[in-house]
């Protein structure tokens, strides 16, 4: 009974997570097309170079307490309340520091306009401090339907505002306002669904209990954020702001695809793994199924993006951005492996081993920085190739480190991953070769998507792939219920 209940909650969580992040990516795609057609490379570059500061500050204010709450069997109001007030204090302090540092940031990147833009954009993480607890409550209880609705309305309202501002000459300010409005709307809707209200006085003793676990996550999350944005940061220092904008555009579309799978998995991974970590065999079954599901989605999506990258960019955001296509294709290959990182990270966290998460991330950053410095004189394309190859290879390190927790060998992981990798690669390669003669870009894009998706589906059906059959059965059950 417990297995069935967990399976049902996991299926619902994955379904609504997929709906939420699928909708998010579609809306981001639509709004991104309109904005990229109006804004310049420099506009995107300006917001890109300060994104690392916003994300790091966001990590500091949340301090890993959302994951700490998820590891509790039944967190109380006192636990949530302590985390809320800590987030407010940390967020306010961080905003004050960054507000004062804005002139230094502008000086570092040789962009005086960053003073005003950064001070306004940094409001986004201050506002987000108010929504961390409601978000954690919905996430812990696998209420992904409500999270999906909040994200939908946040994207629609902020996206429409950004487009209106872009078409009325506000340039990079349209991107800044889009970020601030999005998090404001999302927070309001999260509070509507949770009806959670902070109280005074506040008892910070839960923070002290969670601190040992959370501080390692805090450091790890900061390092992970730096790791994800280090290329943008380095490029912002050594290349022209237009080049940063080109890379940012490629990275944005790559992240749109990769984060759909990563965020869908992340919605359920830690709560589910934490629920079964006292049963070794059950946990092993759950983890391997999540691995197969990730491979089933990630490889066709990301290899497909690499295949259609040229026609997709030219059709959607015009040939003004065609220089980002090679970078997008390279990043997409490496991006296919990033969702597996999420699984291993959540395995470590669900066992309370945030130290493993920390050490792996530190090692990743050290090697990655070395690679960037080594290839920095070879140009942006070579740096991105080296970065993507390293991303693929470092997955083996995560597998080795988490193996004592999951009791899953490298060979077992390869058996779960490689079939989908080879099938997706062959389907995309075959589609690419057989459609090269089509000269119309819109027709080429449509034909490649249809042929590749159909071919992938047919091959999996012929091979009786269990994960495909389960997805189809779940879809049938949802249709019958409705």
Can you name each region flagged by the protein language model?
Residues 1-6, 10, 145, 188-233, ...:
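Interhelical loop/hinge segments that connect adjacent transmembrane helices in multipass membrane
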Residues 6-65, 89-102, 124, 154-163, ...:
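Signature of the first transmembrane helix
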Residues 71-87, 246-362:
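Specific pore-lining/lateral-gate transmembrane helices of multi-pass inner-membrane transport
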Residues 115-122, 149-195, 209-213, 249-251, ...:
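Hydrophobic alpha-helical transmembrane segments
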Residues 2, 403, 408-410, 417, ...:
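Membrane-proximal transmembrane or re-entrant/amphipathic helices at the cytosolic face
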Residues 1-29, 67-70, 74-85, 114, ...:
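N-terminal membrane topogenesis motif
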Residues 13-28, 175-182, 186, 190, ...:
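Transmembrane helical elements of multi-pass membrane transporters/channels
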Residues 7, 11, 68-77, 127-150, ...:
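Membrane-interface junctions at transmembrane-helix termini in multi-pass inner-membrane proteins
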